[in-house]
Amino acid sequence: DCLATTVMYKKKFSKEKFKVFHPGGNIGNSLLLAEDIMVTRNKMPTINYKKNLNAALKEMNKKKLGIVVILKNKHIKGLVTDGDLRRESKNFSKNEDLRKFMTQKPMVVNESMPASKALAIMNEKQITSLLVVSDNHLKKTNKILKGIIHIHFLLKHGIK
């Protein structure tokens, strides 16, 4: 271990290089960030806030993450989960305004959050997905969605 550490120091081999050159190892996995694991762009289940519940269900089924993010001009307005809909299944019509069912302030993390911390948040809050925003949008009220992390992505990467 001493020899390996000395060589790493002399060669200026940082933890970040470990992440690049040895991504499947324990050190590489421990350095993964939210932005390394999230889905982006056309893989994200999103819908305009003016759409109805039927359109949201179609998007949710198409993207298969169990959620749909409600957007207004690219800004996060809320989130609807398959669990939200199951709990209300006897009380809605597919033509209803989906804002009636949405969580208005969903859990949001920044892109540079360690993936292991994202998993800890999911476990603590008993949720399966987190919305990811850029570091400079985290404290803003109008957050722009950058990606989505699902708990299965974290487990697939061996995050603990």
Which residues are covered by each model-predicted region?
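Short alpha-helices
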Residues: 1-12
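Structural motif
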Residues: 5, 43-45, 66-68, 77-79, ...
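Cyclic nucleotide-binding regulatory module and flanking cytosolic helices
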Residues: 14-38
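Phosphate-coordinating loops and pocket residues in cytosolic domains that bind phosphorylated ligands
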Residues: 20, 39, 87, 91, ...
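Short, conserved, surface-exposed binding loops centered on an aromatic residue
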Residues: 28, 36-38, 49, 58-62, ...
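Bateman (tandem CBS) regulatory domains
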Residues: 30-44, 95-106
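The conserved cystathionine-beta-synthase
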Residues: 46-64, 89, 100, 108-137, ...
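Phosphate-binding active sites in nucleotide-utilizing proteins
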Residues: 61-62, 66-73, 78-87, 91-104, ...
